[in-house]
Amino acid sequence: MAANEHGGKLLEVSGLTMDFGGLRAIDDVGLDIFAGEIVALIGPNGAGKTTFFNCVTGIYEPTLGEVRIHPPGGASRRINGMKPNRITALGMARTFQNIRLFPAMTVLENVMIGRHCRTSTSIVDAILGSRKAAREEQECVEKSYQLLKKVGLAEVAGEFSRNLAYGAQRRLEIARALATDPFLLLLDEPAAGMNPQETHELDALITRIRDEEKVAILLIEHDMKLVMNISDRIYVMEYGKKIAQGTPQEIKENPKVIEAYLGEEAHA
């Protein structure tokens, strides 16, 4: 398996193509993610970025191409056609462009929902209140609370998620995704709607997740300051095609990217 300066390959996407009727939303896109990386996927609205995420995470089955994961210490596996919950259980988690929390549940309970894919308690054990069920529930609470501390939400663990400010809800979604113990985390526009201070805090949080949790990150984002600050590599899409890939500096200087997305001001 290939490796770069960070580590072994975790995600390998080749020839990914997605058709909706007569519309080709993604056209022959390839992408690799390696251990220890933060990688950004950028491009104009409608470029196909979220559709790409949906194909990789099992919401859509690609028309053509292959999506393959290489879990650390595990066997390489083709995941085309797998259900999203199965892909999550294999170690690839995501957040969504539109926040998808459970508003009538507490902040802690929202994270615990994510953690339950790592428990093995049966329905019978849960109903009977077995020792195993009690032990796993306590472990779930403790793990979830630790994740809330990591994202700065431990003090509001008992609040309903609907009462959180927008930026805090974004961080709660990240905590819930981390509760699944992923080796790769996909973030779909995590800074959307955030003010500059919240975006600055998110910048630090994403880097901490990579460094402390040993989780690689693939993110879609329009905030170019955030992208350029934290990314090891960047892929650029336009009209469903990949038009460039490289380091932040290479992307800043790429004429195709400047014309399609960044503009001359970003290059200056």
PLM feature spans:
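Glycine-rich phosphate-binding loops of nucleotide-dependent enzymes
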Residues: 2-268
